[in-house]
Curated annotation (Swiss-Prot):
Pfam families associated with the record: DSPc (PF00782)
Protein name according to UniProt: Dual specificity protein phosphatase 21
Gene that encodes the chain: DUSP21
Residue runs in coiled coils: none
Species, as recorded: Homo sapiens (Human)
InterPro entries: Atypical_DUSP_subfamB, Dual-sp_phosphatase_cat-dom, Prot-tyrosine_phosphatase-like, Tyr_Pase_AS, Tyr_Pase_dom, TYR_PHOSPHATASE_DUAL_dom
Length: 190
């Protein structure tokens, strides 16, 4: 379950962060929004073999040679994404072992698909939640799982490692992950 150096190596073609289209997270895992997920040229040029649509809003265009998986979850605090963490992480890993490439997407590529990505990195690359978030944010700066997904990711990290590297804290805007505390203070002081 540990990450090999080649999984994250820039020599494997990992590109600079992309905000609007595809963001390459590992050699075989990409994040995007719903529009990019239906762009045949982007899919082909990135050799995508499987697409996980973590939304109810986006309708995929089905292209030959690509496996499609639907995760019908809304981007709401009370949505149960946790139930999909293991099955989707296992799927991404299986596709990687077969030399395939997976695209995770939701509507914006910010919350649902990012949460599934973090779960995968924890499970199959033995990354803490904090490290998985830091890495993924370096590849796709716009990620920001909703607070309900954060709570589920924190529970998942504890299930995997019997430890937590991120915790929910009280703030003037309600409970937030502690990694956002500094950003919130800066916004409030403006």
């Amino acid at each position: 379950m540990t990450a090999s150096a080649s999984s994250f190596s820039s020599s494997q073609g990992v590109q600079q962060p992309s905000i609007y289209s595809f963001s390459q997270i590992t050699r075989s895992l990409f994040l995007s929004n719903g529009v990019a997920a239906n762009d045949k040229l982007l899919l082909s040029s990135n050799r995508i073999t499987a697409i996980v649509n973590a939304s109810v809003e986006v309708v995929n265009v089905f292209f030959e040679g690509i496996q499609y998986i639907k995760v019908p979850v809304t981007d709401a605090r009370d949505s149960r994404l946790y139930d999909f963490f293991d099955p989707i992480a296992d799927l991404i890993h299986t596709i990687d072992m077969r030399q395939g490439r997976t695209l995770l997407h939701c509507m914006a590529g910010v919350s649902r698909s990012a949460s599934l990505c973090l779960a995968y990195l924890m499970k199959y690359h033995s990354m803490s939640l904090l490290d998985a978030h830091t890495w993924t944010k370096s590849r796709r700066p716009i990620i920001r799982p909703n607070n309900g997904f954060w709570e589920q990711l924190i529970n998942y990290e504890f299930k995997l490692f019997n430890n937590n590297t991120v915790r929910m804290i009280n703030s003037p805007v309600g409970n937030i992950p502690d990694i956002y505390e500094k950003d919130l203070r800066m916004m409030i002081s403006m």
